[in-house]
Amino acid sequence: MRRLGHHRLHGKTGGVGTKGMVAKLSIGVIVLLICTLSLLFSANIGSNREPTRPSKINVEELWESAKSGGWRPSSAPRSDWPPPTKETNGYLRVRCNGGLNQQRSAICNAVLAARIMNATLVLPELDANSFWHDDSGFQGIYDVEHFIETLKYDVKIVGKIPDVHKNGKTKKIKAFQIRPPRDAPIEWYLTTALKAMREHSAIYLTPFSHRLAEEIDNPEYQRLRCRVNYHALRFKPHIMKLSESIVDKLRSQGHFMSIHLRFEMDMLAFAGCFDIFNPEEQKILRKYRKENFADKRLIYNERRAIGKCPLTPEEVGLILRAMRFDNSTRIYLAAGELFGGEQFMKPFRTLFPRLDNHSSVDPSEELSATSQGLIGSAVDYMVCLLSDIFMPTYDGPSNFANNLLGHRLYYGFRTTIRPDRKALAPIFIAREKGKRAGFEEAVRRVMLKTNFGGPHKRVSPESFYTNSWPECFCQMNPKKSSDKCPPNNVIEILDSRLESIRDPDSTSQTNSTVTGLER
């Protein structure tokens, strides 16, 4: 009997639901809708033209998703995609370092690396986060069974490397440790890594953040990344439940916007933006930077002028006001502890008093106990994913914002507001020097040049995880054959191929691996 998670890939739908419908759905149903939309293609679509930029900012339109231009999410294979072979070349272990979303992209890369090498992937290890001191691990954050089941057409996955039983003796396989180069090309995995795997039966790649090149000239490999990121990586039920509780309460009062307010100590120290703080606070930031980042000459005025400083809370408020959002706008803040305290939040709160975070929306003990660390970040991620509008205030090296931008694009071109900090910097600097005439009009001109969530070409340095168009999207009536949606029976095709290589006796075998290795 097939599992529920597998059936979610089969459900029929009449197309992308209206905004009102989405507002009434629970997170579980919405996730189901996301999966269904990307693998089935029975909806009506509009024109194949990409949407043009608006001539003015219409706040009411921003509460709706951007025009799709006839594109829809699709990470299903479109060419010959054989299932994992019965025998693989060995086991692949990886240690994913960084925060929740840096680890998330590393997991996507690990699955792809396993596919490239025809390896059995050992459930990825999540590094105990150095900032949150969180050691929840993969099993504590993600739905393991769903992860394995969803990727059964792509790679074999086990919980740990099994022991070898031979001649009545048990032998443990020790993985050979390798430090992969940053942004390693596919060739490195097919030569250096694969050679070591065949020699030692298992390899351990550590650290594994940004260890596989993002730009790969193979659309099927890129679509596998999307299958991992947007389908296989599902948070555990209790995290989804906490997120659902918050979203339901926010939606009960209408539209809401989420903002990733990146004004925390680690980001400010990384950016080298110290001068707006008092001497004691600057001392704290300099100490943190010295302990955690490479030594570099950083001058605040120069950094700010080129858009390298995170927006302050007040600047965020001024941008929204210039765009003509009013003070009744409900805003959910996804942020850790803001550095500098209330003195920086007060101007923002004056402009937009309806500010919330996960603790203020749902002050339950259960949520309070998990509000910090990776679980708290996971809850923030889900709320931001499902919000009507998402605004990152610093989407440079911020993996949280980058992943969310890509996920919301895949989710149906949901509206995002991405301030161009470099273009806005001289406007804010002039305002601070007393030049306030024409300030809001100048901000609006900058914001009109940004993309609010529709399909757009990925241009370096934009990350694949921020924008997976066009590889992970398709059209029913495309101009190019490579953009054509796969057939409706793609799952049945993959199923039949998988069944053809299965060992009929595998279901009776047991070992120390995660149940589901041979599903």
Swiss-Prot record:
GO terms for molecular function: glycosyltransferase activity. InterPro entries: FucosylTrfase_pln, GDP-Fuc_O-FucTrfase. Residues 67-86, 497-519 are annotated as: Disordered. Its main location: Golgi. Residues 506-519 have a biased composition (Polar residues). Glycans are attached at residues 118, 327, 357, 511. Residues 1-24 are cytoplasmic. It comes from the Eukaryota. Residues 46-519 are lumenal. Pfam families: O-FucT. GO terms for cellular component: endosome; Golgi apparatus; Golgi membrane; Golgi trans cisterna; trans-Golgi network. Keywords: Carbohydrate metabolism, Fucose metabolism, Glycoprotein, Glycosyltransferase, Golgi apparatus, Membrane, Signal-anchor, Transferase, Transmembrane, Transmembrane helix. Pathway: Glycan metabolism. The chain crosses the membrane at residues 25-45. It is found in: Golgi apparatus membrane. Coiled coil: none annotated. It is an enzyme of class 2 (transferase). Its EC number is 2.4.1.-. Substrate binds at residues 260-262. Disulfide bonds: none annotated. It is a single-pass type II membrane protein. Belongs to the glycosyltransferase GT106 family. This is O-fucosyltransferase 1. It comes from Arabidopsis thaliana.
